[in-house]
Amino acid sequence: MKVWMAILISILCWQSSSWAVCPAWSPARAQEEISRLQQQIKQWDDDYWKEGKSEVEDGVYDQLSARLTQWQRCFGEETHRDAMMPPLNGAVIHPVAHTGVRKMADKIALSLWMRERSDLWVQPKVDGVAVTLVYRDGKLNKAISRGNGLKGEDWTQKVRLISAVPQTVSGPLANSTLQGEIFLKREGHIQQQMGGINARAKVADLMMRQDDSDTLNSLGVFVWAWPDGPQLMTDRLKELATAGFTLTQTYTRAVKNADEVARVRNAWWKTKLPFVTDGVVVRAAKEPESRHWLPGQAEWLVAWKYQPVAQVAEVKAIQFAVGKSGKISVVASLAPVMLDDKKVQRVNIGSVRRWQEWNIAPGDQILVSLAGQGIPRIDDVVWRGAERTKPTPPENRFNSLTCYFASDVCQEQFISRLVWLGSKQVLGLDGIGEAGWRSLHQTHRFEHIFSWLLLTPEQLQNTPGIAKSKSAQLWHQFNLARQQPFTRWVMAMGIPLTRAALNASDERSWSQLLLSTEQFWQQLPGTGSGRVRQVIEWKENAQIKKLGSWLAAQQITGFEP
């Protein structure tokens, strides 16, 4: 077993180091950054435990707390976990300590942990607040908040008002101590779609209120531990269900390996449940005697949390891109995070104005999720660094008629035009994207957006970053492009018309297009006066005329005199 534990620790350490790189800060800056985040988390803790309020989403709090711990370890500071524990206004001792649960990084780590154990069961990791329920002589004698695991606050009066908690029990439960989760009741909660809804904070708020309102009936309880209870899990579940704790039996499943856990975890992630969850807990039926339970020392259970719907990511750099139309967009380069099995390292912020409204700088922590079609998006800026240096955006000198010809200032828009003309809906140049175009342009110094038509097989073969086998295919693609219809080439030149309007125009030659009048363009579908002015300006542009003449010299269909 020691060998397997060593392997497990090695894997966890490797994963931690691969995703959590230490910041390159001076000692002074590290102290400032850590102190600021520590103060903020302490403020959130005070709001949460003293007033039952939460100014931050549960998931954001958890991730920023983990980030603080990471920074503290990076710079040799103590983690001070006690700072994140609730203040003990009361000091009621738990009959049995709350151990907490160690989290597994992934399925591999879980598999290694399970390999050395038997009689294993999986339960949902219900998202609420932990509680101890003490029954004496068949009656609810005391309810204690988790607190620091050893002591908590007296919640007895509050819990007695929660109708979902049995006030009387019998049989083996008559004199028992139970541990569980007070949760917010939900009807058909689908975790994948609805997320955490800040359930933990909402429960804490209800439990902290001074008034004993009917809203406590919106709470339920999920018992996940019966210290010193029956040895067989099936017996435990049966007795709990008979007493009224039916959810425990319904949502506790026997499992033999990590594959089975993964299937249950995925099912609970996607199906309707009566509570919010943030993962699953795998536990061995065999537990030590309760007198040996201590916070942080439970070896008989582990958690495998869901990947958060939104992840906190550090902004590593701010980059500017110029699109084919000349619009400047801003992109944030991120320390990699995983979202729904997708590694995210970049997120589009939008326009320069939007970036300025977000006020994002390198070193900030932003909340990122996936929008439709798996596209990363920014949900919020959750933490701003102490030192914030924002880059200066490029001058807004570009428009839809600039950068058909290469120049130093036109680098980004020029590349964007190449990417556009190579796309499936234009010339359909398979096998080349932005990186390939950059390599070709840097090596062969294109004059304009169609210069690639002159490249020889030898030139393509000698282009850095393009394999010999791929260079032959690319040359073939470039030659096939010569056979594309006239309208595709006009689209590649950036005519400000939709494909439908262009096809309806029935233009089949460059000379005919140049002679078309304003009245002709106005007859096309979806072409208003503003669009017509853009077309006239486009076809009269000197760069466009020069490109048309060049394509005629290359005998491209529709451009020949």
Curated annotation (Swiss-Prot):
Catalyzes the formation of phosphodiester linkages between 5'-phosphoryl and 3'-hydroxyl groups in double-stranded DNA using NAD as a coenzyme and as the energy source for the reaction. Belongs to the NAD-dependent DNA ligase family. LigB subfamily. One of its GO terms (molecular function) is DNA ligase (NAD+) activity. The gene is ligB. One of its GO terms (biological process) is DNA repair. Pfam families: DNA_ligase_aden (PF01653), DNA_ligase_OB (PF03120). The active site is at 125 (n6-amp-lysine intermediate). Keywords: DNA damage, DNA repair, DNA replication, Ligase, NAD. It catalyses: NAD(+) + (deoxyribonucleotide)n-3'-hydroxyl + 5'-phospho-(deoxyribonucleotide)m = (deoxyribonucleotide)n+m + AMP + beta-nicotinamide D-nucleotide. It is an enzyme of class 6 (ligase). InterPro entries: DNA_ligase_AS (IPR018239), DNA_ligase_B (IPR020923), DNA_ligase_CS (IPR033136), DNAligase_adenylation (IPR013839), DNAligase_N (IPR013840), NA-bd_OB-fold (IPR012340), NAD_dep_DNA_ligaseB (IPR050326), NAD_DNA_ligase_OB (IPR004150). It comes from the Bacteria. This is DNA ligase B. SUPFAM superfamilies: DNA ligase/mRNA capping enzyme, catalytic domain, Nucleic acid-binding proteins, RuvA domain 2-like. PANTHER family: DNA LIGASE (PTHR47810), DNA LIGASE B (PTHR47810:SF1). Its EC number is 6.5.1.2.
